[in-house]
Amino acid sequence: MQESSRSLSSTCELVTELLQELREPAGILRCEAEALLAGIVLDTKSFTIRTGERTFDAAARLRRTGADTAEVKKLLQTDMEDAIAKYKIMQSAQLYRKVAVAAPQEVQTRVVAAQAADELLNISGVEASIVVARDGKGRTFASARSIGELNVQLIMERLGGGGNRSAAAAQFDDCDVKEAVKRVYAAIDEYFAE
């Protein structure tokens, strides 16, 4: 295995490389190969971000081991209720400085909010997205995603959160969604002022 793991797209890519070192490819079960490939597909957003030569090598290795891409797709499917919730979140989005900011009125799970943030990146003209919502425990949070030059980690850090360049989050312990959205817009403005 190569020394540097900084260039890896995901933990699943690292595990795939480790498994190659530890045992024969035939020793990996099909379901294990599919789970690892699903992780790589998810973390790279279908091979569009943080993807390098090693990513494709790992995916090809898993495919040769027996991973079925149709089964991988099934592993990543969303149930109908979550899909509807995701699209309701997207309907609430407004474009501000190439950032889609969504603030649904309904209580949301963090998973669905993150999926909606991912989905908003498929819209032309959107370089980043931030979903601000309230979870089932009454906590206000933000889930941010980016595919371009815009670094959502820096925006979320201004709000007390963190993450990485393409995926970040923050939690607001002291305000409702409306106030959190105001803070998000201010953080976006500060980001662009630098």
State the predicted function of each range.
Residues M1-A59:
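Short alpha-helices
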Residues L42-E194:
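Hydrophobic helix-and-loop "lid/oligomerization" segment in the mid-to-C-terminal part
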